[in-house]
Design a protein with these regions (language model features):
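Interfacial loop-to-helix junctions that mark the boundaries of transmembrane helices
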Residues: 54-65, 125-134, 156-164, 184
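Interfacial loop-to-transmembrane junctions
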Residues: 147-170
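Membrane helix-loop-helix hairpins that form the core translocation module of multi-pass transporters
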Residues: 28-87, 144-155
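Juxtamembrane transmembrane-helix termini in multi-pass membrane transport proteins
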Residues: 1-56, 116-135
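Small-residue-rich segments of transmembrane alpha-helices in multi-pass membrane proteins
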Residues: 40-44, 95-108, 163-175
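Small-residue-enriched transmembrane helix starts and helix-helix packing motifs
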Residues: 1-12, 35, 80-107, 130-136
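Juxtamembrane boundary at the C-terminal end of a transmembrane helix
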Residues: 174-184
Length: 184
């Protein structure tokens, strides 16, 4: 559940949803974009969760909590900066399926959600649930973006939403960090 909520909040105003909207407009196939987004997001989250499963047992519980706090603080801090427009992938000539799947995978693998997935997977006995939750949570935002298209997506009040969500991430990150350091 934590991965679902964190991913859904983090994707609002993020570049992955924006790229999904761009590709949906280009190919006029929102269903294809959504399917490839699900595949790409699950692959990226699965890799992050697998790494978390390897790292988690090597860390003390406080270290796991501190790592999650850091992930939330980084995601929250990044939310205060405007999202840079994603590469439109205009020069990619590998077809709609491959362009969408690879483009979204590359973008998703580098975003803050994956660090959150890694840290959540490190703390749980079933790391795959972090990947599944993050994938579904991300799709909660990416599906509407793909269905709306870029122009409608960008008309949403994304900046104030990013700031509000960033504030929430920062608050939770600070509380978790203070708890991990035994300061509260």
């Amino acid at each position: 559940m934590a991965a679902f909520v964190a991913a859904a909040l983090a994707q609002i105003g993020d570049r992955t949803a924006w790229l999904a909207a761009i590709l949906s407009d280009r190919y006029a196939k929102p269903g294809l974009v959504i399917a490839m987004a699900a595949l790409a997001l699950f692959a990226a989250s699965g890799l992050a969760a697998a790494l978390g499963a390897v790292i988690g047992p090597k860390l003390a519980p406080n270290a796991q909590q501190l790592m999650l706090a850091l992930a939330l603080l980084l995601q929250g801090g990044g939310s205060f900066f405007p999202a840079k427009a994603p590469e439109r992938l205009d020069r990619w000539k590998i077809g709609a399926i491959a362009t969408t799947a690879l483009g979204l995978f590359i973008l998703a693998f580098g975003d803050g959600v994956q660090f959150i997935v890694l840290t959540l997977a490190a703390r749980t006995p079933v790391p795959a649930l972090a990947a599944i939750g993050a994938t579904i949570g991300s799709l909660v935002v990416i599906v509407p973006a793909a269905l709306m298209g870029e122009a409608a997506w960008l008309r949403l009040p994304l900046k104030p939403l990013r700031i509000a969500i960033g504030t929430v991430f920062l608050i939770f990150g600070i509380v978790l960090a203070l708890g991990a350091l035994r300061l509260v």
